[in-house]
Amino acid sequence: MRDQGRLDHFLVFCHRTSILNQWKSAAARLGLRLEEWPCPPEQSQDADGLLVTYQGAGRQREALGERLKQWSLSACMAIADEAHHLGVDPDEPDATAWGQTFLELTGSVRLRLGLTGTPFRADNLAFCAARRMRVRLDDSGWVEQIRPDLCVEPRDLIAAGDVRPLEFRFQDGWVEHSREGHPDRDVSPLSAEQRESWRARNLRRAIRLADSSSIGQQVLLRAQQKLNQLRERQPQAAGLVIARDISHAEAISRVLMDDGNRVELIHSQSPQATERLNAFQSGEADWLVSIDMCAEGFDAPRLRVVAYLTTVVTRSRFVQGITRAVRMTPELAAREAIPREASYVFAPADPLLMEYARSWSVAEPYVLRPQEQEAEDEQPGVGAWRGPSLPLEAVEDGAGAVIRLKTPELPAFLQR
């Protein structure tokens, strides 16, 4: 459209400054010059477009609006990167500042393009420039969905060689729940537990680092073994551990360092966290241990192994975490055939995580759900006890079992 003379300028919104730099570099490879806003008028005068964070646009809405008046907006494209950050409640369209700012600044442009690989973060929130359509689901009645104009599924990218496939190794075992002073014990199978409150309790116990036979320790051990194998072919390969909280991340880091690994521990309270994340991308550390710093926008193609040891089990967070290990570079692509060599995910055999693993490479429609949903009542006494607990231990040899999944194509029996 630029070559055809239908577009003159581009206005790109991002949620992080680091992603602005990625857009600037990508545009330069296409012969386009994008300047970060705010900038002096003479610097942006001959630019092909502007880059701005959502927060920056909100703070300087008036000034940016005046600058845009110098453009012919009928020949301008506005791009919302990670558009799920612009979620607007249809019943309260003024409630979300970023979405409202985007609407006001781009109301007169020729095209608005929203890009996202992440489901919207809350029920009933829709990207403010997206199409909403009512769809009938068999006998379940009508639902409302966000309908994208173009959907590129991860499995399509895998087939094209643009990203790596993932293979999953889920550590199974029996989880024992005992109370101090009580001779009786409750034993629950990690991968087969159907009661939600017990499933959640099992996962909390499974990620603990008790002793060498614990499920969490086995996940770390097998992840290290796989990374060592991968480093024989790719010496710069690294691993990522996603922990539950800061103290948990520190404990994991100690285990990895005791095993002789070079570890970079980075979390939201770490000094110079962004700079250290950037340094890790081309650094020498074997492992990056983090909590929530390595989601969207973090790009480290040398990551080949992910150990998922957190109690966050939403599909969006799981997929965000594991897809840090699918990135490719032109240099890597030149050395590998298609499909690319797989990366690996290690995690406790939680039923929800295994369900997500079976479908991560397929895009799911985003459904706008009713605003109010009745929570299921828990059975009295189930999952409510928070007293002293014993270290997690393997019951018989259950902790030695590993459930293996490959994607995107799965055996029929795993798709039931």
Where are these regions (language model features)?
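Conserved helicase motor
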Residues: 17, 36-44, 53-59, 85, ...
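Conserved RecA-like P-loop NTPase helicase motor core
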Residues: 262-371
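Conserved helix-turn-beta segment of the N-terminal RecA-like "Helicase ATP-binding" lobe
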Residues: 18-41, 258
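Conserved Walker A/P-loop ATP-binding site and its immediately adjacent core
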Residues: 6-29, 244-247
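Loop/turn-to-beta-strand initiation segments
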Residues: 8-9, 46-50, 74-77, 108-113, ...
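SF2 helicase catalytic motif II
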Residues: 56, 68-114, 118-120
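Long, largely alpha-helical accessory region at the distal end of helicase-like NTP-driven motors
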Residues: 209-211, 215, 226, 347-416
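Interdomain helical connector at the RecA1-RecA2 junction of SF1/SF2 helicase-like NTPases
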Residues: 124-236
